[in-house]
């Protein structure tokens, strides 16, 4: 097989692996790859998989027969744009400010959150009220859209003044408490609160 034909077959295999994972949630077996791309020899497929791995397009786990993961470089080779999270403005972690709902940019979706794709957004945090939870001024929080939360979860909530804030959520007897993670700051006590989502991730781009 010529170099050009070999490269074409490898891309065909890579595409089949990607499509299979997207459709059913786990990779194909080597025999399934053989049938899909018209190869009769499993050793030939193993050779193509090894070359795809050397090129940085695929990650294999030799101890698990179906452990095939396409890398970001592999997806780029297939012309697949990475999934992205919309960045929808700024939320304060000190005193609440008016929420900004316009999408300002997009952020690559972390692989471990792909199952929540379409339900996530990102907000930049200003203020120090959540520092004991590890959320610092300038951090970006990844938020899964949901309208309810359990006590103790960190949420993005709208106050009754139509302002947004990041706090730890508590529902108490006759009110809601949005609790900062900073001993110098008081909680926000509300009769009504609207939860925009739960904080499920954090991105910091200024690590020293």
Swiss-Prot record:
Enzymatic reactions: Hydrolysis of Ala-|-Gly bond in repressor LexA
Enzymatic class: hydrolase
Highest taxon listed in the record's lineage: Bacteria
Alphabetically ordered keywords of this record: Autocatalytic cleavage, DNA damage, DNA repair, DNA replication, DNA-binding, Hydrolase, Repressor, SOS response, Transcription, Transcription regulation
MF GO annotations: DNA binding; serine-type endopeptidase activity
Stored InterPro entries: ArsR-like_HTH, LexA, LexA-like, LexA/Signal_pep-like_sf, LexA_DNA-bd_dom, LexA_repressor, Peptidase_S24_LexA, Peptidase_S24_S26A/B/C
EC number assigned by the record: 3.4.21.88
Residues with site note (Cleavage): 93-94
Catalytic residue list: 129, 167
Biological process, per Gene Ontology: DNA repair; DNA replication; negative regulation of DNA-templated transcription; proteolysis; SOS response
DNA-binding region: 30-50
Gene3D superfamilies documented for this protein: Umud Fragment, subunit A (2.10.109.10), Winged helix-like DNA-binding domain superfamily/Winged helix DNA-binding domain (1.10.10.10)
Family: Belongs to the peptidase S24 family.
Known role: Represses a number of genes involved in the response to DNA damage (SOS response), including recA and lexA. In the presence of single-stranded DNA, RecA interacts with LexA causing an autocatalytic cleavage which disrupts the DNA-binding part of LexA, leading to derepression of the SOS regulon and eventually DNA repair.
Record's subunit section: Homodimer.
PANTHER family (alphabetical): LEXA REPRESSOR, LEXA REPRESSOR-RELATED
Protein name: LexA repressor
Lineage, top ranks: Bacteria, Bacillati, Bacillota, Bacilli, Lactobacillales
The gene coding this protein: lexA
